[in-house]
Amino acid sequence: MKRICVDMDEVMADALGEHLLRYNQHFGEQVTLEDLHGKWLWEVVSSDRHAVLEACLRSEDFFDVLAVMPESQRVLRRLQMNYEVFIATAAMEVPTSFQAKYRWLAKHFPFIPASHIVYCGDKSILRADYLIDDNPRQLRRFKGEGILYSSPHNMGVTGYKRVNDWLEVEQMFLG
């Protein structure tokens, strides 16, 4: 059975939406997804506000309240019928996120066994046929086939198969 690894943030969980919401509320601004086209949030806001961005990510409840990406639950459940599915999240970038990410996955994806959740900073260690991720840095080093999940920051990235949503993931893997 072929193996698919799936990133969590910006693929299964809308971390960017929550990050924008908290940033905009804190500063009374209206930064939008369109403002981020081809850029990370960190590149759009002034460097004197990076500490607030970091504090948002490190807040205890940040990863608990993320919205689920539309159709991800249904499609991942279907994928499990034909593939070995693992969740691979780069939690090392925000060490305070381990427990919250686990709780979030248990709440929204209870059908994914704990043994299929991998916390890793460098996804080149994964042994899988496919990796679905929004971060091209992770795909570059991955040994299998990288699938780029669209997010505002990666809109200018080429060189990978791209999916824009979970319906396209479903079509790609299940026809």
Regions found by a protein language model. Name each.
Residues 85-97, 116, 156-167, 172-175:
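Membrane-proximal envelope and lipid/glycan-remodeling enzymes
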Residues 132-166:
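Acidic, Mg2+-coordinating phosphoryl-transfer loop and its flanking beta/alpha structural elements
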